[in-house]
């Protein structure tokens, strides 16, 4: 027993130490990012910090790859010290394995070393980024590397009004990113570059308001969605997010399952070019090989890119809330096999359930989809009610979870999670009221680990808990006119103070009796005095 306690304490201490070091890393990174931007808006400046961090990562990743192999034969080998001509011999094999090639002179460490004396640093960097992308031309990795540096404009006025000012700012960025002691943190088991990148994106998103919320889902929500989608699955063929943003939801599956248990990889589609690039960079930074991620640019509803793929075992998404779409203005969509089963298209002013139907059509028979939804889709009438009726009658709705308000960047609305399955064991739907499962941190609410665990265990156990969750069958949902709002099925706890009217009445009667007795005593005393 003592041994187990000792091991548990050691594990807790390691976790605490890792958390402290992670916080230290985060504080350092954000301080550097803020100092670098100066008067430039943080949202506009993010491309430079994130882009140069990525450049450092791929440089070190590639150099370490060669050093690790060559030092088995020659302990003094250093890829960064080779001439470009000497390194050319490994170009082909490097592209096959890593997806791109960086000659020694173009590595981050060497560019950083020469930066203070390079009066054309912006030109140097632009040429390097162009050559990195060109190295993948004609290779299987081409689509995953092409345009990765497109948003990193080293000649932008955001860096300075003159050539010299821009070079000075770029030098400072290189020195700041290069000065981060990221290697020290790797000893703590922290996925340093990936962790730093996700932290920076979260901070930029939180400071950007609505625009930030469009590309980044908070980590704690991403983790909950992934674990719900993975219930009863120890491995999956692949995972899909049709509105993948920066890719944080997809990457949760690597963290929860391990990359080897996502056999065919990570699939996503993103409509915004900048966010699409952020997502691909995020994949590389989390050491996902180019052959295992398939992120494409385009409109998911009108131009789906993964329709020929085999169905997905896991689908997770946080689609844009009540965004407009073409809807029935395009009559061809009514014949689209994604939407036609419901017999109606989602309304033009709110595409939420169009995304839901799209995901359902891509889901495998043994798979699970976990989707963040705007609450209006649960109760609005018209076409959305007809789609809900279809989903209920076909027994696709496994669970509806009401989330706390103010969880997401850019909106304070209380959203919900809709869980879809094609292989339900019975016709019941679980409704969970998790609206109070949060801890307030600053201006936002957070789903802490205990909150996430409570929601997940409730989903897994599927047992009714008064005032927290309830099961409803098809008939009951039909009686509620296919309204899927959680408060229709989970009775709210009455927290008002209950006043016992009988108790004060009893006290009043007792006071009256005492008052009467005192009067009688007083009358007796007065009579005695008169005698």
Task: Map each language-model feature to its residues.
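Non-catalytic, mostly N-terminal accessory regions of nucleic-acid modification and defense proteins
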Residues: 1-224, 228-229, 291-300, 402-406, ...
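A conserved structural/catalytic subdomain of Rossmann-like adenosyl-cofactor enzymes
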Residues: 2-14, 20, 303, 307-531
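Conserved, well-folded catalytic cores of nucleic-acid-processing
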Residues: 35, 176, 180, 199, ...
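A generic secondary-structure signal for well-formed alpha-helical elements
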Residues: 56-69, 204, 233, 257, ...
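Short small-residue beta-strand/loop micro-motif enriched in glycine and branched aliphatics
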Residues: 205-208, 262-263, 439-440
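Conserved S-adenosyl-L-methionine
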Residues: 211-317, 322-324, 328-333, 338-343, ...
């Amino acid at each position: 027993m003592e041994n187990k306690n000792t091991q548990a304490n050691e594990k807790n201490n390691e976790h605490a130490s890792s958390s402290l070091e992670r916080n230290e890393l985060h504080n350092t990174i954000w301080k550097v990012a803020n100092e670098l931007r100066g008067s430039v808006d943080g949202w506009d400046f993010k491309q430079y910090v994130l882009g140069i961090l990525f450049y450092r990562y791929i440089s070190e990743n590639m150099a370490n790859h060669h050093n690790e192999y060559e030092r088995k034969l020659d302990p003094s080998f250093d890829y960064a010290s080779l001439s470009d001509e000497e390194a050319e011999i490994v170009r082909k094999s490097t592209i096959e394995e890593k997806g791109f090639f960086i000659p020694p002179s173009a590595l981050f460490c060497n560019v950083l070393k020469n930066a203070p004396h390079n009066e054309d640093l912006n030109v140097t960097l632009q040429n390097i980024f162009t050559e990195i992308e060109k190295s993948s031309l004609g290779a299987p990795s081409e689509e995953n590397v092409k345009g990765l540096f497109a948003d990193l404009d080293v000649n932008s006025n955001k860096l300075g009004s003159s050539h010299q000012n821009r070079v000075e700012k770029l030098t400072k960025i290189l020195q700041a990113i290069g000065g981060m002691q990221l290697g020290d943190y790797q000893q703590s088991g922290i996925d340093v570059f990936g962790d730093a990148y996700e932290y920076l994106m979260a901070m930029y998103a939180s400071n950007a308001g609505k625009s930030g919320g469009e590309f980044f889902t908070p980590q704690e929500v991403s983790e909950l969605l992934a674990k719900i989608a993975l219930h009863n699955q120890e491995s999956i063929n692949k995972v899909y997010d049709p509105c993948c943003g920066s890719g944080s939801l997809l990457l949760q599956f690597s963290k929860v399952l391990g990359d080897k248990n996502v056999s065919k990889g990570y699939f996503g589609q993103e409509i915004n070019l900048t966010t699409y690039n952020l997502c691909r960079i995020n994949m590389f930074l989390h050491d996902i090989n180019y052959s295992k991620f398939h992120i494409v640019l385009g409109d998911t509803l009108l131009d789906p890119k993964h329709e020929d793929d085999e169905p997905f075992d896991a689908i997770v998404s946080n689609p844009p809330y009540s965004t407009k779409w073409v809807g029935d203005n395009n009559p061809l969509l009514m014949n689209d096999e994604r939407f036609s089963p419901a017999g109606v298209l989602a309304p033009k002013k709110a595409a939420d359930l169009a995304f839901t139907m799209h995901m359902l059509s891509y889901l495998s028979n043994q798979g699970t989809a976990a989707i963040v939804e705007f609450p209006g889709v649960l109760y609005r009438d018209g076409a959305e009610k007809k789609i809900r009726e279809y989903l209920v009658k076909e027994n696709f709705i496994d669970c509806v979870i009401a989330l706390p308000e103010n969880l997401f960047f850019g909106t304070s609305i209380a959203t919900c999670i809709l869980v879809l399955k094609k292989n339900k064991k019975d016709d019941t739907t679980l409704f969970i009221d998790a609206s109070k499962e949060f801890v307030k941190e600053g201006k936002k609410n957070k789903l802490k680990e205990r909150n996430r665990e409570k929601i997940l265990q409730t989903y897994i156990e599927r047992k009714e808990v008064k005032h927290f969750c309830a099961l409803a069958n098809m008939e009951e949902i039909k009686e509620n006119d296919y309204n899927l709002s959680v408060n229709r099925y989970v009775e709210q706890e009455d927290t008002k103070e209950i006043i016992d009217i009988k108790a004060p009445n009893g006290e009043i009667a007792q006071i009256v009796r005492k008052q009467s007795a005192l009067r009688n005593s007083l009358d007796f005393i007065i009579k005695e005095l008169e005698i």
